[in-house]
Amino acid sequence: MEDGSVFAGRLIGAEKIAVGEVVFTTSVVGYPQTLTDPSYKGQIITFTMPLIGNYGVSEDQLESDGIKAEGVVLFEATFPSHYKSVMSLEEWLASSGVPGVARVDTRALVQMLREHGVMMGAIGPEDPAVLMEALRKSPHYEDVVYVDMVSVKEPVLLGEGRLCIGVVDCGVKRSIVREFLKRGVRVKLVPCRRTELAFDCDALFISNGPGNPKLLDFLSAKVSEYVEYKKPLMGICLGHQVIAMALGAGIYKLKFGHRASNKPVRDIRFTGRTYITTHNHGYAVDPRGTDLKVWAVQPDDGTVEGLYHERLPILTTQWHPEASPGPQDTRWVFDKFLKLVERHGH
């Protein structure tokens, strides 16, 4: 670890060194979706659930074309038993070139991260001194623009329908695209550095993605330009942060972030209900001094989880309403946004 701490375990997966920001998730299930979520690019994931790998790996659970996390830390990688499984977790990691460490005291590691905050770390088969040297030579997570590594390179057209949603791909999850497609709209995926290619759509959506949002001035500037058209705009996770930045909000880093599929979010504007939701974010928004209004908060720490605009058709969520993994109770957010598109998108 960056502070010199060493956690020993059994190497699984690829026999190589991986460096990344060490984070943790408290999700009990959903490790295939978690590992393939592009938002984890640049990070080493620690699973607090002690048994990971119970149901193997199946193609229909993946959120991208492969594992995007840099590495995995867990307590026990179990032998899989599931009729859809095509390989074990260990086999998947090895074939993907991703290292992992099992039999780690994950409780002690997570307690340290909660107390001192997330930090850089390295895992691999080498001595601690070699891992520390690799860590020193690697760029810090907060200084790398990861979205370029997970975005499409050229526009992609998907689906059929009267309405078109332009999706700026910062590392969009497959399940988000599916939520739009199953509602009968067309999706135009565009590279994160070519946002203007989606301006001709009925609405713009800024996707989830990895890394420090403060490095994405090139994207927030395009969003600011788009806002002038007064057309519908939505963002999830990183997209929520980018839209907030474009409208003047501040961004700050959380001590250890929200990464789980059991986080409560309270809707203080539309339904008045509290929902259990899926999260994966290490940064948060401070909208004070802007025209953005808060519609959802995380009751444990008061983090802003949803924003809207009283005069413009803008709606954002910091959490993942598509879930995958996790509760599906807030998928209605997509329906709410499409109603905005029906009213304002033509």
UniProtKB/Swiss-Prot annotation:
Catalytic residues of the enzyme: C237 (nucleophile), H320, E322
This protein's pathway: Amino-acid biosynthesis; L-arginine biosynthesis; carbamoyl phosphate from bicarbonate: step 1/1; Pyrimidine metabolism; UMP biosynthesis via de novo pathway; (S)-dihydroorotate from bicarbonate: step 1/3
Example of a GO biological process term: 'de novo' pyrimidine nucleobase biosynthetic process
Annotated positions binding L-glutamine: S39, G209, G211, L238, Q241, N280, G282, Y283
GO cellular component: carbamoyl-phosphate synthase complex; cytoplasm
Glutamine amidotransferase type-1 domain span: 164-346
Reactions mediated catalytically: hydrogencarbonate + L-glutamine + 2 ATP + H2O = carbamoyl phosphate + L-glutamate + 2 ADP + phosphate + 2 H(+)
SUPFAM superfamilies in the cross-refs: Carbamoyl phosphate synthetase, small subunit N-terminal domain, Class I glutamine amidotransferase-like
First-level EC class: ligase
Keywords, sorted A to Z: Amino-acid biosynthesis, Arginine biosynthesis, ATP-binding, Glutamine amidotransferase, Ligase, Nucleotide-binding, Pyrimidine biosynthesis
GO molecular function annotation: ATP binding; carbamoyl-phosphate synthase (glutamine-hydrolyzing) activity; glutaminase activity
Residue span of region CPSase: 1-160
Annotated EC: 6.3.5.5
SUBUNIT field: Composed of two chains; the small (or glutamine) chain promotes the hydrolysis of glutamine to ammonia, which is used by the large (or ammonia) chain to synthesize carbamoyl phosphate. Tetramer of heterodimers (alpha,beta)4.
Family, as annotated: Belongs to the CarA family.
Function comment: Small subunit of the glutamine-dependent carbamoyl phosphate synthetase (CPSase). CPSase catalyzes the formation of carbamoyl phosphate from the ammonia moiety of glutamine, carbonate, and phosphate donated by ATP, constituting the first step of 2 biosynthetic pathways, one leading to arginine and/or urea and the other to pyrimidine nucleotides. The small subunit (glutamine amidotransferase) binds and cleaves glutamine to supply the large subunit with the substrate ammonia.
Protein name, UniProt field: Carbamoyl phosphate synthase small chain
